Structure formats: structure tokens, C-alpha cells
């Protein structure tokens, strides 16, 4: 008999799984009433069986046709509150509450609720004829006590149809006006399913219905990969939908604890990775208890706010086997004010018994945070910076567990505020026992209130603190602190939803697909006859700043900015596209603002409306400018800083920024970014990611970069495109190397550290003379410091800062119990505050420089492609002290700047040579070969092939520039020889 591959067989296989004992569903044999949108007999039977007294009351109040009137009351409740709310809380009729379903209790000890849950009639029906005006049927419907809640259209590639056909069917063949398809009245989720993919929507809106992918990811949920689903050796690729997601208990769990109504108009069904991460986190906590650390690497576009809200709610409502909450409080640490409102709205829709979410926002102080913790608030939202003020005022934490959810976990988690959070919440019983053993004392001999003991025992991990760190761009320190340690010593995220998957699934746009870079070519000359010695790096920065702020430079770029907006941005997103200009400084932002305005007026353009965004006041030309003074509406009124975002969204289309709105700014209409600032690492990813938000009509983005090379941007994004992990844990003993280097300066001694510690850690240190005594101890140390040379003072301060920062990191990772080192760290932290940096004589180059030559040249246009590879961090190491800024003659500094930015423009060969040098210098493979080869092998055997490839690639990008290279053999060989020798030396230095 031939194998059956029809759609009916697909439908039959799904139904068989759902109707099995494992699936938990039964087939509904009752009739469906299309006008009421209910399996009426099923609903009434459930109410009569589970709430006999309430039903008797209802019949008494409604003796004529009580069934029809009950259905009417139910429909009225759905009209008023929505079906999701009615499912969770029921509805009231004449003072009596009627429940239409019961959910599984959190605690297994709650037998009564468990029995009620078992009385639900959870049904699955094939070929659901939903209308009395058409003969159309939906392939499958799932109902709770006669109320249709989820529906499926199934397609089969073997019969020539896919999920795309199912989408069309939902959009064009299903009337949203039908009772069963009205928003939040019956069906809460519309699914399109084929053999390989699942898509879903929560609102039918004809051709405007928005379907989202509901797939696991190409390597499975929570794993590194792209869009789609992994192979399933045991059946269909999409079997997770009916075997896991819509298994009876799972489906009821989603209705009770995941689905939410936001803004009263958007019904949220969790995406697969969100459902997966929350359930895996809860399962791990149930298995291991408190004290674990979890790193969740979820990209922009992952719905991180909802994931945090669901995680917070589930952790706050999690009970142990003794029917007690696992966590005394769940504390969400965030700097995003939008998360406050979203968490409160989402959680209040789940459970009215948890109490209000305590948001300790800008309008509240640290005392409010202390009170919320001491009063046992179930969910608290706060910033990290409020903990240092109250960490000693939190009541006894022994025996209490806390869950700390960190929104956008970065290196701030290695600082003082993070340590104070731990000090406030930690149950130090185990740490005290460990400390006593190391000291060779009985536990009762150790005073837990001793200041030094309290600080030492707050370090490292604690059995009562669970950390859940969410971030799209984990740094090495973040992985070390929160990542899961593998047997080989590497640290990995607990769960991953990668940037690659978010892009491939269409939740964010790839901001690197349309990227254009320019190089700024200029030559600067000095206008004075003398040639003074100046600090090289400071002078170089000033000269570079001179070029950046030069009126000619800004005028040329302003023209490109305006014309790019008019030619590209203004035509995007249905004519609503917007642009952001990222400048290098507040002064640059002010000057760009004026120059762009001038150019717009000069050209007579009326379609470019600009705003500026920066903090504080900026003096320029004797006038002080603020954001509010520059930003003016069409009616002449000034725009307050708090209104800039709103005005940009509604009435303006170009925003010029300086260190503002580069992170956390969510404007979906932002299409184009002009970059005139050096961007590196996480900062580059966060800044450019302002463009990646999606909205109807937005299909691409555009970046024009005046400063950064395409390769630099690729290197910034690559580590976060897929999974990021730390190859090896930190060597905590490296801190002793820094300590030894500090001591070599002989600025302070053990006696100084001990004298300071005696004052700092004494129990009465809060008396009025404590600060005076501490500063008295530090005074002779400062005197010895001041006797050092300027270069030595610079080195010492760098090392001092390094030790304090390094110790803060190490004490988060490990509990060292090194009293002497801890004392020295506290001593160094206060000494650092006392030692002022050396007075730096101002460099005045005003009137001493002039711009001789300037040219903007396009160097790259196209897509910056990222590899399908994981990002790897080497172990975190300490930063050594940097050398003092040497002085060089002004002529020499200008020569170096001109060389770096191709100042000798009369010689075309020099441009060619420099371009090839830059391309080859950026080749990591070539660098590795240079470091492992002798000069002859490198120049004769290795380099020629690399040079030829670079020359050909360069020719393809700029034929006019590089054609002469292939026309003159002697020139080709001369340049290749010169570069081979030069680059070999450069590579060997690294």
C-alpha cells in the first residue's frame, strides 16, 4: 500500500497526538453554535458540574431560557473585558462570580484547585465549521470548556502548499466579523502550519493581518543558529507545536501565565524562544534552588521586555514543596523607565494576588527601595545606583532568597554598586563558616557585624542570590559573572536568541546591508615659524579636532547629509523615513545644526526639518547653546528636552545627536544614520542598532560613515552575531602582579594601609572625626606621591585605578578572604580620590594651523557580511599602566597626521601604496604567518600571493586609482617589495 502524504493525513497525525493520553485532549461531540461562537452544551455542563450553587442561583434569577441568558452574560463579559480576562477571572452576574475554566495551581498541596483543574473539558476538533453563512471550515480548533481559543490551518508541501497558502486563507477566506474571529472574543491565536514551519497571529484583520514566525531556530530553541527548525529524527519538524506547546497542560499554562493584552489593543502570544527561556529558567530553579547565575543572550528584536516580565512573574509566584515562595522578592535592575510600566501592565494582567509591582523610579529614593525589600514586595524595579545608599539598612536576610533580574547586563555589574547590591541581599552564613575555617577559628568566634568581615563575606556567589542577566551584547566580564561554566573552563550563555536569528526571522533589519564609508583626506600646515615641542597624543587629538570642526569640513559633510536625506531617506517608509546624525562632540553637534540649517535655507528646501539632541550648555563664538534653545517648532515655540523624542517622531525628520539617543532610543521610522564619530565594540553595535527596528513599509536601512572603516564595523558586530562565549575563566591571581607593581613606587607601606584600615573599619567610624583621621593617615602618602616625577605620578595613578577596578571584578567572581588585599583595596580606593591628576597645561593651537587640502572620498559601498561563527573572548586580564605622553616637535606631529590621513595628494602612487598597506595590515591570516616565519620566507613565498589578491580586490573597487599598478611591472614589484619589508616589521611588533 503506497504511503499517504495528503493534508488529511497530516491533520490526522496531529489530532492523534493531541487526543492521546500524552496530549490530554478529548474530541468534542457537542454541536457548535456559530451565532454564539460556543459549543454551548459543553460550557453549560462545565458550569453546572463545577459550580452547582452558582448555577442554581442563575437559574432562579433567570427561569426562562437560562442557557441562552448565561451565554449572553458570558458574551457581554467578553465584550467588556476580553476573553483572556474572562478565562482567568470569570465574570460577575448579579453579585455572583462564574468561572469558565480553572487553572493548575502553583503548589501541589492545593488539592481543591487541582481537582477543579481536572474537571476542565479541553477538546480538539477537526474540520470546524464555524459559520452559518458559509460552508467553510478550519482544519482544527482547540477549545476550553466549549470556548474556541486556538485554530490551525494545515498545509503540506507534498501536495504543493505551504504556510504561505495558510496565511492567505486566514487573511482572505476568513471574515474577521464572525463571532469566533472577533478580537479577544473567541480565538486568541491563528496558526499556519506546514511540514517545516509555523507562523501565527493574534488578530485577524484581512490583508493587514500580521503573522509572526513561531519556529524554534535552525539548531533548536536557545541554541546558536538562524531561522527555521532543526531536523527531527522522530517525526515532523513542526511536531513541537502539538507535542509540546499545545499539549493540554502547556496550552493552559500559556493562557494563564503568558498571553497578555498590552495597551488594550495588542494581544501578545509568546514567541517560541520566549516560552522556552522562561520555562527552562523556572525548571532549572526548581531543580537546583537559589544561588545560580544565568546569562540570557537575546538580541534586539527578541522581545526582551516581555521575557523579563514573564520571568519576573514566574519567579515571584514560584513555590517550593512546603508551599512557600522560593524567593522573598524578585528585583529587576534596569535603567529603562519604559520597563516599569510594561512590567506592571503585563503582571497585573496575570495575577491579582501578587500585589502591585514596586517601581522605585526617578520620583522615589533609596529609602523607598529599602522599605520595599524589608516589606517583602514580590516584584521590585529599581536602578543599580540606589543600592550603595541603603545596603546596610536592609533587614536580616538569613533564610531569605532573592532573584535579581538584570536588564542589559554589562560591565557595570563589576563595579561598587553591584557589590553593594550583594552586600544588601546576601545570606552570608556559608561565607562566615568558610571564613572561620580559613582563620582557624570557631564560627561563633567570628563577629558577623565586624565591618571587615561583612565586606569579605559579601564577595563571590551566595546560596540565596539568583541572578538572571539579559543582554544582547555580553562582554567578557558579563560571561565570567553570569555565564554557565562548561567542563573545559569556558563560560557560555544559558540561552541564546541570536542577532542572526532575529534578522532572518524579520524581527529586526540588518543595518549592515547598505553601508557606505567615506575617508576624509586632508593636509594641515602650521602658520607659525617656530616649532615647539608638544605632548604628541594631545597635540594629535587637537589637530584632528581642528580638522573635524573646521567650517569647510562641516560644510562639505552638511551638504552630503541634506542631499542624502532628500535623495534616499525621504522616499523610504512611505515618505516618513527619518535620519540620525551621530557627531563626535556637543560642539560638533551645534555646528552641524547651524550649517545644515544654513544649507537648507540657501537651497530653498522646505522638506528637511532638523532637531539637535545633547546635554547641558555648549559655548561657541561667545554664545551658549542648549538643546531647547536650538529646537524650535514651526510656530516659533521652543521644544523642551523632554519633548524632543515626541517632536522628532511627529514633526521632524533629521536628528543631530552628541552622546544622546545612541542607546535605548526606539524610533521605528529611523531609516538612515550618518556617522561622524569613531565607534568601537559594543558601542558600535548599540549605536547602529538604532536603525534596526521594523515597522510597516520599512524594508531596509542605510548608513553613511565618515569615520569608521567597513572592516572595523564588521569586527564590532561579529562577536554578537551568534553566540558569544568566554574561552577560559579569569586568573584571579593576576591582581597580585598589579599590587606588586604599585608597591615598587614606595609611595605607601603596610603600616599606612594598616593605619587607614584601623580608622575605616572601626565600629564607630561614623563619628564626626572619622573622616579627619582617615585623611590624616593619607596625607604623608600624598606627600610622598607629590615628590615623584610627573611620569611616575601618571604611572602610579594608572596602577592605582587598575587595582581598584580589578579587585571589584575579582571580588564579584570569587570569594578570596584575603584580608590584607581587601584592606589595601579600600586604602587605594580612598587614596585615588585624594590624589588629584597632574595639572595639564592647556595646549593652544588657535591660529597656528591651517587646512591646506581637503577631500571627501567614498571608500566602500555595499553589504558588510558577517560570518556564521561564534564570538570568542580571551580571558579577562588586567590593564597595565600606560606610558607618559612624549613630546615631539609640531612639524613631526603634523607630518604623522597627514600621513595617516593621506595628506600628500599630489602623488597618486602614495594613495595607492597607503590603500594597499591598510588592506594588508588588516589581514589577520597574514599577520599570523608573519609572526611565525623568517623574513626571507615571508617576503619571497608568503607575501606575493597576499599582495596580488589585495591588489586585484582594490582594482575591482577603484579601477581608476589602481589601473597604473598593473600597467607598470617595475612599479608593481617596487611597491610589493616595500610593503613586504614594512609590514613584516609591523606584524612582528604586535
Which residues fall in each region the model found?
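Interdomain helical connector at the RecA1-RecA2 junction of SF1/SF2 helicase-like NTPases
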Residues: 226-238, 242, 477-576, 593
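Conserved C-terminal RecA-like helicase domain
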Residues: 544-655
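Conserved segment of the helicase C-terminal RecA-like domain
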Residues: 690-719
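ATP-dependent helicase/translocase motor core
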Residues: 2-329, 338-354, 385, 399-401, ...
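A short beta-strand element within the Helicase C-terminal
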Residues: 654-657, 662-686, 701-705
Amino acid at each position: 500500500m503506497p504511503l499517504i502524504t495528503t493534508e488529511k493525513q497530516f491533520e490526522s497525525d496531529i489530532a492523534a497526538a493531541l487526543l492521546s493520553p500524552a496530549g490530554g485532549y478529548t474530541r468534542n461531540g457537542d454541536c457548535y453554535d456559530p451565532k454564539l461562537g460556543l459549543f454551548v452544551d459543553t460550557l453549560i455542563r462545565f458550569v453546572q458540574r463545577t459550580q452547582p450553587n452558582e448555577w442554581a442561583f442563575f437559574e432562579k434569577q433567570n427561569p426562562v431560557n437560562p442557557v441562552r441568558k448565561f451565554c449572553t452574560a458570558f458574551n457581554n463579559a467578553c465584550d467588556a473585558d476580553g476573553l483572556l480576562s474572562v478565562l482567568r477571572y470569570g465574570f460577575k452576574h448579579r453579585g455572583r462570580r462564574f468561572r469558565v475554566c480553572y487553572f493548575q495551581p502553583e503548589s501541589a498541596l492545593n488539592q481543591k484547585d487541582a481537582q477543579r483543574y481536572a474537571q476542565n473539558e479541553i477538546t480538539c476538533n477537526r474540520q470546524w465549521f464555524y459559520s452559518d453563512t458559509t460552508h467553510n471550515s478550519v482544519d482544527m480548533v482547540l477549545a476550553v470548556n466549549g470556548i474556541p481559543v486556538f485554530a490551525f490551518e494545515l498545509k503540506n508541501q507534498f501536495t504543493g502548499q505551504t504556510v504561505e497558502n495558510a496565511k492567505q486563507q486566514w487573511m482572505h477566506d476568513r471574515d474577521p466579523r464572525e463571532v469566533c474571529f472577533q478580537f479577544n472574543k473567541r480565538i486568541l491565536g491563528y496558526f499556519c502550519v506546514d511540514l517545516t514551519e509555523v507562523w501565527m497571529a493574534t488578530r485577524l484583520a484581512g490583508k493587514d493581518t500580521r503573522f509572526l514566525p513561531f519556529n524554534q531556530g535552525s539548531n533548536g530553541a536557545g541554541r546558536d543558529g538562524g531561522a527555521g527548525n532543526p531536523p527531527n529524527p522522530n517525526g515532523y519538524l513542526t511536531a513541537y507545536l502539538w507535542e509540546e506547546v499545545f499539549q493540554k497542560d502547556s496550552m493552559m499554562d500559556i493562557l494563564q501565565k503568558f498571553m497578555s493584552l498590552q495597551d488594550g489593543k495588542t494581544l501578545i502570544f509568546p514567541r517560541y524562544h520566549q516560552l522556552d527561556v522562561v520555562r527552562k529558567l523556572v525548571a532549572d530553579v526548581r531543580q537546583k534552588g537559589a544561588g545560580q547565575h544565568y546569562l540570557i543572550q537575546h538580541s534586539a528584536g527578541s522581545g526582551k521586555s516581555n521575557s523579563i516580565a514573564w520571568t519576573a512573574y514566574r519567579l515571584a509566584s514560584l513555590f517550593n514543596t512546603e508551599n512557600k515562595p522560593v524567593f522573598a522578592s524578585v528585583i529587576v535592575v534596569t535603567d529603562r523607565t519604559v520597563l516599569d510600566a510594561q512590567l506592571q501592565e503585563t503582571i497585573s494582567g496575570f495575577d491579582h494576588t501578587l500585589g502591585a509591582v514596586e517601581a522605585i523610579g526617578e520620583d522615589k529614593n533609596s529609602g523607598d527601595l529599602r522599605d520595599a525589600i524589608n516589606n517583602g514586595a514580590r516584584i521590585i524595579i529599581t536602578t543599580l545606583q540606589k543600592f550603595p545608599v541603603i545596603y546596610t539598612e536592609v533587614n536580616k536576610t538569613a533564610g531569605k532568597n532573592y532573584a535579581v533580574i538584570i536588564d542589559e547586563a554589562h560591565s557595570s555589574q563589576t563595579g561598587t554598586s553591584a557589590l553593594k547590591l550583594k552586600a544588601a541581599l546576601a545570606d552570608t552564613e556559608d561565607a562566615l563558616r568558610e571564613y572561620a575555617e580559613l582563620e582557624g577559628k570557631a564560627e561563633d568566634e567570628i563577629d558577623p557585624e565586624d565591618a571587615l568581615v561583612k565586606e569579605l563575606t559579601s564577595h563571590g556567589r551566595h546560596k540565596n542570590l539568583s541572578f538572571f542577566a539579559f543582554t544582547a551584547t555580553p562582554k567578557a566580564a558579563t560571561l565570567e559573572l553570569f555565564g554557565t561554566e562548561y567542563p573545559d573552563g569556558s563560560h557560555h550563555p544559558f540561552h541564546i536568541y541570536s542577532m542572526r536569528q532575529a534578522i532572518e526571522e524579520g524581527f529586526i533589519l540588518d543595518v549592515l546591508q547598505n553601508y557606505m564609508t567615506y575617508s576624509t583626506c586632508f593636509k594641515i600646515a602650521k602658520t607659525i615659524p617656530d616649532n615647539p615641542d608638544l605632548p604628541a597624543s594631545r597635540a594629535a587629538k587637537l589637530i584632528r579636532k581642528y580638522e573635524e570642526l573646521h567650517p569647510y569640513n562641516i560644510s562639505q559633510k552638511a551638504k552630503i547629509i541634506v542631499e542624502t536625506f532628500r535623495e534616499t531617506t525621504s522616499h523610504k517608509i512611505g515618505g516618513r523615513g527619518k535620519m540620525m546624525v551621530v557627531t563626535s562632540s556637543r560642539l560638533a553637534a551645534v555646528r552641524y545644526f547651524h550649517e545644515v540649517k544654513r544649507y537648507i535655507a540657501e537651497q530653498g528646501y522646505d522638506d528637511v526639518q532638523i532637531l539637535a539632541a545633547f546635554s547641558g550648555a555648549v559655548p561657541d563664538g561667545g554664545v551658549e547653546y542648549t538643546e531647547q534653545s536650538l529646537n524650535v517648532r514651526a510656530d516659533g515655540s521652543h521644544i523642551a528636552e523632554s519633548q524632543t523624542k515626541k517632536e522628532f517622531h511627529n514633526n521632524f525628520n533629521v536628528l543631530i545627536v552628541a552622546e544622546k539617543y545612541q542607546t535605548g532610543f526606539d524610533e521605528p521610522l529611523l531609516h538612515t544614520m550618518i556617522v561622524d564619530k569613531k565607534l568601537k565594540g559594543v558601542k558600535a553595535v548599540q549605536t547602529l542598532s538604532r536603525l534596526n527596528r521594523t515597522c510597516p513599509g520599512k524594508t531596509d536601512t542605510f548608513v553613511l560613515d565618515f569615520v569608521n572603516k567597513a572592516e572595523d564595523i564588521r569586527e564590532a558586530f561579529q562577536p554578537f552575531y551568534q553566540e558569544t562565549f568566554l574561552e577560559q575563566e579569569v586568573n584571579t591571581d593576576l591582581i597580585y602582579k598589579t599590587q606588586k607593581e604599585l608597591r615598587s613606587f614606595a609611595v605607601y607601606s603596610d603600616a599606612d594601609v594598616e593605619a587607614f584600615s584601623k580608622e575605616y573599619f572601626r565600629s564607630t567610624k561614623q563619628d564626626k572625626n572619622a573622616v579627619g583621621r582617615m585623611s590624616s593617615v593619607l596625607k604623608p602618602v600624598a606627600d610622598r606621591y607629590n615628590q615623584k616625577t610627573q611620569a611616575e605620578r601618571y604611572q602610579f595613578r594608572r596602577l592605582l585605578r587598575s587595582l581598584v577596578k580589578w579587585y571589584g571584578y575579582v571580588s564579584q567572581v570569587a570569594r578570596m578572604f584575603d584580608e590584607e588585599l581587601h584592606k589595601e583595596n579600600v586604602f587605594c580606593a580612598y587614596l585615588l580620590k585624594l590624589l588629584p591628576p597632574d595639572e595639564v597645561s592647556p595646549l593652544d593651537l588657535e591660529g597656528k594651523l591651517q587646512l591646506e587640502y581637503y577631500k571627501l572620498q567614498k571608500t566602500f559601498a555595499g553589504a558588510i557580511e558577517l560570518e556564521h561563527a561564534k564570538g570568542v573572548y580571551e580571558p579577562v586580564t588586567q590593564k597595565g599602566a600606560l606610558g607618559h605622553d612624549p613630546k615631539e616637535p609640531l612639524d613631526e606631529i603634523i607630518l604623522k597626521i597627514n600621513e595617516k590621513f593621506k595628506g600628500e595628494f599630489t602623488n597618486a602612487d602614495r594613495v595607492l601604496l597607503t590603500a594597499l598597506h591598510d588592506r594588508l595590515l588588516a589581514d589577520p591570516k597574514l599577520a599570523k604567518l608573519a609572526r611565525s616565519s623568517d623574513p626571507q620566507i615571508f617576503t619571497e613565498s608568503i607575501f606575493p600571493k597576499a599582495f596580488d589578491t589585495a591588489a586585484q580586490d582594490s582594482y575591482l573597487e577603484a579601477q581608476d586609482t589602481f589601473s597604473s599598478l598593473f600597467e607598470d611591472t617595475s612599479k608593481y614589484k617596487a611597491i610589493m617589495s616595500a610593503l613586504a619589508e614594512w609590514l613584516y616589521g609591523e606584524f612582528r611588533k604586535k
